Amino acid sequence: MNANGGHDIQLVIITGMSGAGKTVAIQSFEDLGFFCVDNLPPSLLPKFLELMKESSSKMSKVALVMDLRGREFFDSLIEALDEIGETSWITPRILFLDAKDSVLVSRYKETRRSHPLATTGLPLEGIQTERELLEELKGRSQIIYDTSDMKPKDLREKIVQHFAADHGHTFTVNVMSFGFKYGLPIDADLVFDVRFLPNPYYIDSMRPLTGKDQEVSSYVMKWNETQKFLEKLTELLSFMLPSYKREGKSQLVIAIGCTGGQHRSVTLAEYLADYFKKDYYTHVTHRDIEKKSRK
């Protein structure tokens, strides 16, 4: 029970770019036992939550998909979020799904569907319009997933790992390795560049391996600069993480980048996740590990 006599509700609002994976997301929340509503008009959101508060069903987990169909729809959503924000009995979390424009265009071509905001029928026009309209909403979002390199199962796994009630944590440290050659991860809160470390790519026996292999991991970790860097980085993060948690942040995405996302970044991401798991719920992902390594 909360201070107002109602029951506590975990509310997740799923929004973001059309084609970024909202259908997969809502299905994943259903699998987690959330009460799910697809395309609830924003103007009805405050009333919907009041009804849930007064309901005898005591649903404690709710996920709502809210799509952008036009500027009027967007304005209503912002107003609804402001109204909810003035209440003290519920704090919604916004999950924003994003992807690169080129990926979204490709997905629309594969499905042969029209973008809802494309007046000329060209997907890119609608995508650019939608991205501009959603800029403020993205800025309000507590959780941002870049699904550009995700298969549906990857997105489903990420949601389950983040929102599954059985892990009993309200703050998650997500450590991600990536390759700079494939672009920066747009959902990262902190990015660290480890391209200054000796690169096992140039050793023939290690080139086809990854940082999850012992031979590569031992090579990366044996250098003095690696040990010094990790000493300073863990000290910095140990200072920062409690403050992020205190501010109410539900997750922190720490991205470690090397050239191709195969060797150095993978080794260090694995190390950091293991280092902090004693104090935080941690999850490690390797964004580019399955991509073919090439120079």
From Swiss-Prot:
State the UniProt keywords alphabetically. Answer: ATP-binding, GTP-binding, Nucleotide-binding
Q: Where, by residue number, does GTP bind?
A: D67, L68, R69, G70
**What InterPro entries does the record tag this protein with?**
P-loop_NTPase, RapZ-like, RapZ-like_N, RapZ_C
Q: Does the keyword GTP-binding apply?
A: yes
Example of a GO MF term = ATP binding
Asked if Nuclease is a keyword of the record, the answer is: no
Give one Pfam family, short name only. Answer: PapZ_C
Q: Which residues bind ATP?
A: G16, M17, S18, G19, A20, G21, K22, T23
Show the NCBIfam families listed in the entry: PRK05416.1
**Which family is it part of?**
Belongs to the RapZ-like family.
Please give the function described in this protein's UniProt entry. Answer: Displays ATPase and GTPase activities.
Provide the protein name. Nucleotide-binding protein BLi03725/BL03417
Q: Which organism is it from?
A: Bacillus licheniformis (strain ATCC 14580 / DSM 13 / JCM 2505 / CCUG 7422 / NBRC 12200 / NCIMB 9375 / NCTC 10341 / NRRL NRS-1264 / Gibson 46)
